[in-house]
UniProtKB/Swiss-Prot annotation:
Coiled-coil ranges from the UniProt annotation: none
Annotated protein name in UniProt: Ribonuclease T
Binding positions (Mg(2+) 2): D23, E25, H181, D186
Gene name for this UniProt entry: rnt
SUPFAM superfamilies linked to this entry: Ribonuclease H-like (SSF53098)
Family annotation (InterPro entries): Exonuclease_RNaseT/DNA_pol3, RNase_T, RNaseH-like_sf, RNaseH_sf
Organism of provenance: Shewanella sp. (strain MR-4)
Annotated Mg(2+) 1 binding sites: D23
SMART domains in the cross-refs: EXOIII
Family that this chain belongs to: Belongs to the RNase T family.
Length: 222
């Protein structure tokens, strides 16, 4: 029983990694030249039964960094006006200092040793996050430098669809296309999808795995 209870702790679920769901809205596809305009970060928690759920979400509108490229097509797609004062935008550095603080606190509370980005088509979000951290010359990032959990891949395996909206609907998660392409909305739907996949795998008997000690005993008996 103690082995099962221990396996239900978040620190043991992903090899000591604390999953942090992130979505960004940008002014293009090039993380080196195009502006990061919006970011939302959803922190997760695990209950005593080992089920993953949403804890809280942070959200920031971001000021384009100096010299940033703003692709008109990208702005038309996400509907963001970077010059609108009502956005209440903050600098990349201010946003990431707050994100680091919240992530490290949650990571420590879960007794995890590092955080790992969860995102839909994660290479895109990870690239923009990593470049912004580099631009701000921030040290001791809580995030793994290259490993991620990509919900597009996970959804393709678990649900049979890779598009966020359709994967959510197939998983029974409401999705409003009118709200899509807002970092806040997309992050929370991505978090719900990730939790659904992880929890479904558990319900199907995929976790926890047979304890190493039990496996060794079985091998010895054979």
């Amino acid at each position: 029983m103690s082995d099962i209870s221990d396996a239900n702790k978040l620190k043991h679920r992903f090899r000591g990694y604390f999953p942090v769901v992130i979505d960004v809205e940008t002014a293009g596809f090039n993380s080196q030249t195009d502006a990061l305009l919006e970011i939302a970060v959803t922190l997760l928690k695990m209950d005593d039964e080992g089920l993953l759920g949403i804890d809280k979400t942070l959200h920031f509108n971001i000021e384009p960094f100096e010299g940033a490229n703003l692709e008109p097509e990208a702005l038309a797609f996400n509907g963001i006006d970077p010059t609108n004062p009502l956005r209440g935008a903050v600098s990349e550095k201010e946003a990431f200092l707050e994100i680091f603080k919240a992530v490290k606190k949650a990571q420590k509370a879960s007794d995890c040793h590092r955080s790992i980005i969860v995102a839909h088509n994660a290479a895109f979000d990870h690239g923009f996050v990593s470049k912004a951290i580099e631009r701000c010359d921030l040290k001791r990032s809580p995030f793994h430098p290259f490993a991620t959990f990509d919900t597009a891949t996970l959804a393709g395996l678990a649900i049979g669809h890779t598009v966020l909206a359709k994967a959510c609907i197939m998983a029974g998660i409401p999705f409003d296309n009118k709200e899509a392409h807002s970092a806040l909305y997309d992050t929370e739907r991505t978090a719900e999808l990730f939790c659904y996949i992880v929890n479904r795998w558990k319900h199907l008997g995929g976790w926890p795995l047979l304890a190493a000690g039990e496996s060794e005993d079985t091998d010895g008996e054979e």
